[in-house]
Amino acid sequence: MLIQDGDKLINTRNWAELVKPEQLVRDPKSNELYGKFICEPLERGFGTTIGNSLRRVLLSSMQGAAAVAVKIEGVQHEFTTIEGVMEDVTEIVLNIKQIRFAMTTDEPQFLTLRVNKQGVVTAADIQENQNVKVLNPEQIIATLSEKMDMEMTFEIRMGKGYVPADMHEGLVNEIGHIILDSSFSPIRKVAYSVEQARVGQMTNYDKLIIEVFTDGSVTPEDAIAYSAKILKDQLSVFINFDEMGSEQEESKESDLDLNPNLFKSIDELELSVRATNCLKAANIRIVGELVQRTEQTMLKTKNFGRKSLDEIRRVLDSMELKFGMVLEDFDKKHQEWLKRKEKNEA
């Protein structure tokens, strides 16, 4: 479709005719620390393009919290030892860098650790506040060979990526205040692979499988969403025409030529008895009502399972339809179609 945008002629077929992924499927084995996601179908080559872009953004640009400085009572610098402590201060600092935090504020936070004991001191001994949570309390900080006092104060900040100690801004550089190299990224690992996907009888499409491992301060689903938003914002500067206007023109054209299969009754689809009964129980009588539902909504329907969903999806694919379609004024158009049908049959 060609549309006019000022003095520019826009060919919307450049993107409108590309196959688009229907949804992002989350693997049932996913949890708060690990997520596996499947995106299909994609045009050939798009799996690698999108997968690699998301991976790079996830690893480099996600905001997270980390300790940026620590003050250890009685210690003037990190190149020393503490009597009664098995580790030297350099090793203690390395252990502190391994502590992961979740923060609910952009303001710097200060946490304290105070113990009087013998044995292992861990991140669980840090006194949390309402804005900061320790995500790996089992992380060892130091080992005390005798009963003794140990006190530390940590400065926690938000940031992204890896920041060397000499690159931190606004930190007090004084004796006893040890500034740390900080790894803010909440993403521990990202992996992706690309497989073949089928659309109708065609198999030359991509299926993107991406796995995300986090420290728990952000869910894998949110991390994927944030990285996609970053890419979208960064790429928007390259678009030199009115997106909204072109989308409205496309919508007008599609309204004039609705897929006639949308007006078919559910009984005409020759579905299994179970699938048909589930649709009728959900008050879905025609295909146009069905395709406006999302797959997630359908799976919440009583007695409607994955097997029925796959069966219906195959039927919709054969009619070049899919779940989650937006059909403006469909009820009105359905009534107009019924009137034309009655008139033609009279």
Curated annotation (Swiss-Prot):
Transmembrane segments: none annotated. This is DNA-directed RNA polymerase subunit alpha. Homodimer. The RNAP catalytic core consists of 2 alpha, 1 beta, 1 beta' and 1 omega subunit. When a sigma factor is associated with the core the holoenzyme is formed, which can initiate transcription. InterPro entries: DNA-dir_RNA_pol_insert (IPR011262), DNA-dir_RNA_pol_RpoA/D/Rpb3 (IPR011263), DNA-dir_RpoA (IPR011773), RBP11-like (IPR036603), RNAP_asu_C (IPR011260), RNApol_insert_sf (IPR036643). GO terms for cellular component: cytoplasm; DNA-directed RNA polymerase complex. It comes from Maridesulfovibrio salexigens (strain ATCC 14822 / DSM 2638 / NCIMB 8403 / VKM B-1763) (Desulfovibrio salexigens). Pfam families: RNA_pol_A_bac, RNA_pol_A_CTD, RNA_pol_L. DNA-dependent RNA polymerase catalyzes the transcription of DNA into RNA using the four ribonucleoside triphosphates as substrates. It comes from the Bacteria. Signal peptide: none annotated. The N-terminal domain is essential for RNAP assembly and basal transcription, whereas the C-terminal domain is involved in interaction with transcriptional regulators and with upstream promoter elements. CDD domains: RNAP_alpha_NTD. The gene is rpoA. GO terms for molecular function: DNA binding; DNA-directed RNA polymerase activity; protein dimerization activity. Its EC number is 2.7.7.6. Keywords: DNA-directed RNA polymerase, Nucleotidyltransferase, Transcription, Transferase. Belongs to the RNA polymerase alpha chain family. GO terms for biological process: DNA-templated transcription. It is an enzyme of class 2 (transferase). The keyword Transcription regulation does not apply. Residues 1-242 are annotated as: Alpha N-terminal domain (alpha-NTD). It catalyses: RNA(n) + a ribonucleoside 5'-triphosphate = RNA(n+1) + diphosphate. Residues 258-346 are annotated as: Alpha C-terminal domain (alpha-CTD).
